[in-house]
Structures are given as structure tokens and as C-alpha cells.
Amino acid sequence: MPRTAAAVLAFAGLCLCSVPMMAQFNGLLPSGNVYGGFSYAQLTNVVVQQSYKGWNASFEALPFVRLPRLGLVIDGSGFYRRGETQYNAMGGPRFSTNIGKWRPFVHAMAGIRHLDSSGMVYQPLVIDAGGGVDYKLWFKNFSWRLQGDYMHSKYASAVQNDYRTSTGIVWRF
């Protein structure tokens, strides 16, 4: 019986102490969003520019209390065509603002591209400049995103100027 009473008192004490501890973190945890959607791109596969379909996903953290419109974003995408796959992993800053239900944004990112074309593998650096808009949906914390990007890379002694459009769902936290 004394062990049960001690366990109950310890649990009650832990619960009572956790409420003030949660107040300490209020406002310190970064806010942000997670995005996932469908993507269409005009990409150069070594020499020829072709159409690709695939996916795009990103995670944005808004860690700066004094700069609430500036976020840090990590972006990943994959594009597919018969005999070819292309993946991008990028990161960089994003600037956004809220205008009613709309949230326009611009970003600049850099990262790496992995292109597998008929057994030949290339992994050049890629630079991305783009932007878009989120429209707040009637669901709490959800938005719909339209996004466009220009991606620049160089491999196989040629310069690639690629374009990507994406659309999908955003969850804000």
C-alpha cells in the first residue's frame, strides 16, 4: 500500500510540475509548415529539355522571433520519365507575408541534384529561385499551395535551365 501511495504522489507531483514547465516553452518552439504535392517540370536531361512528372515536399521552420516573416526551408523533389529519374535536395531562406487568406512567399535555395539517365549518374549542384502563394482553407491550419521555381545547374559540360511548378496541401503548426 505505501508503494502505491508513493507512486500516486509522485505522479501527481510530476503532473503539477509539468504545467509550469509547459509555460516556459510557450513561444519558444518554432512554428512552421510541412508541404507535399504534385509537381510538373521542364528539365534538361544532359542535353535535351523534356517534361517530367513527380512530387515535391518541403519543411519550413520560422525560428526567428524578431523576424517572423523569415523562415528556413528544406525542399526535396523527385521527377520521373521512362529510363530516367531525377531527385533534388535543397535548402535556404524563405520570405513570406500574410495578406488575408493569402500568404505569398519567395525563396532562394541551393543543394544537390541526382540524375540517373540510362545508367549514367550525375550529381551537380543546383541553385533554385522561386516563389508562390498559399491560400488558407476552411480546415484549421491547412492551406493550398501553388509554387513555381527556376532551377539552374551545370553538368556534362552544359548548362541546365529548368522550370518546376507544384501544387499541394500545406499543414501549419
Provide a role label for each language-model segment.
Residues 22-66, 72, 76-78, 166, ...:
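Short glycine/proline- and aromatic-enriched beta-strand/turn motifs that initiate or cap beta-hairpins
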Residues 31-33, 52-56, 86-90, 126-128, ...:
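Transmembrane beta-barrel architecture of outer-membrane proteins
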Residues 39-43, 113-115, 150-152:
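Extracytoplasmic loops and strand-loop junctions of Gram-negative outer membrane beta-barrel proteins
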Residues 44-53, 79-87, 117-123, 154-162:
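Solvent-exposed loop/turn segments connecting transmembrane beta-strands
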Residues 136-173:
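Predominantly the C-terminal beta-signal and adjacent terminal strand-loop region
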